[in-house]
Every structure is written in C-alpha cells, then in structure tokens.
C-alpha cells in the first residue's frame, strides 16, 4: 500500500472552507485531483479524521493531507461537481449528530462547516463501523482512496461512494428489465415455434 505525506505548514494561512474561485488552491490540490480523477464507479473516497487507521491490504491508498475535513470535502465536492464521469453519494456516521460539544469541543462548528462543504448534497447516515466495513470490503475488488486529514474530532469522516456520471442506477435497472423481457419473449417464441413444428 502506498502512503504519501504532505506537510505544508503554510497551509494554515489558508482559511476554512468555501468555494471562492479566487482562492489559491491548497498545496495538496493537484495530487488529490489526480488521484480522484483516476477513480470510477464503485470506488470510494474517504475524507478521514486523523485517527483513521492505515489499512495494510491492497486496494486502499492513503494520502495524508494537511487540511481539515470540511476544507478537503469542499475541494473534492467542487472537483466532483465538474466531472461528467462519476456522481458521488455522500455518507456520514450516524453518531455524528449526537456528539456533544462538551465532550468534543469544536464539533458544533465542525458540523456547520461540513454542511456548507457538502453544497446541499443529500447525505446518508450509517453506523460508523458499518461504513468503515462496507468501504473496506469493497477494497478487495475496487480502489478506496483515503484522504487522511488533521481533524481530531470523533465520527468526523466523510465516505463518498462513486457511481457513473452518465449512466445512473435507474437507467441500469431499466436496461436489465428490458433485457430480461426480451430474452423471455425470445424463449417463449422458441417454445411456440417448437410446438408448431411438432
């Protein structure tokens, strides 16, 4: 497994998230874009809190990014919104809304920043353990990119599953149904032809 670290202290000068086009891209932007552009359907991007484990099995690539989760999410969402190749589905831990600011100082501000960074996209919630297991089980067949952030807050990772940008699940379901119907019709015609010949 490949592991790349980006240590850019001057990144601290770049403020929070937001999609202002006049902002200078962060130092890690080009590498993250290149990695994201290589992904396709059924791949995952995990924008992870700082304690997220480095997985030793193949299929998982970890990059340490000198940024906070909302900043990285904002950048990746901006990039994916320009893509015609893939469509993202966003997932967060079901536990996140229940973490109190008393026990995890800064979590209230984090939730506000994350909501902004997701640009109004629909977000599904699952148990954190289930999300981690699901994404890692897919890693046995498909690539998972982990962007490990500096964020030190519980349940703050964002799991992004990629689907086709030009062929959605509804289109795939309809295609499969049409194929089944056509094959069934052909079988029925063959049966009728055989009965006629006998």
Describe the role of every protein-language-model region.
Residues 103-198:
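Glycine-rich, aromatic-bearing surface loops/beta-hairpins
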């Amino acid at each position: 497994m490949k592991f790349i670290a980006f240590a850019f202290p001057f990144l601290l000068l770049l403020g929070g998230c937001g999609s202002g086009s006049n902002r200078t891209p962060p130092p890690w932007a080009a590498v993250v874009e290149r990695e994201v552009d290589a992904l396709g359907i059924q791949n995952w991007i995990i924008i992870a809190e700082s304690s997220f484990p480095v997985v030793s099995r193949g299929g998982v690539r970890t990059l340490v990014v000198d940024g906070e989760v909302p900043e990285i999410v904002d950048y990746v969402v901006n990039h994916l919104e320009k893509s015609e190749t893939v469509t993202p589905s966003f997932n967060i831990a079901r536990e996140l809304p229940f973490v109190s600011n008393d026990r995890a100082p800064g979590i209230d501000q984090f939730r506000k920043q994350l909501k902004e960074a997701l640009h109004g996209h629909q977000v599904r919630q699952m148990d954190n353990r289930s999300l981690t297991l699901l994404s890692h089980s897919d890693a046995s067949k498909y690539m998972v990119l982990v962007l490990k952030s500096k964020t030190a807050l519980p349940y703050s990772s964002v799991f992004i599953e990629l689907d086709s940008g030009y062929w959605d699940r509804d289109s795939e379901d309809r295609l499969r149904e049409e194929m089944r119907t056509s094959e069934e019709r052909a079988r029925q015609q063959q049966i009728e032809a055989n009965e006629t010949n006998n």
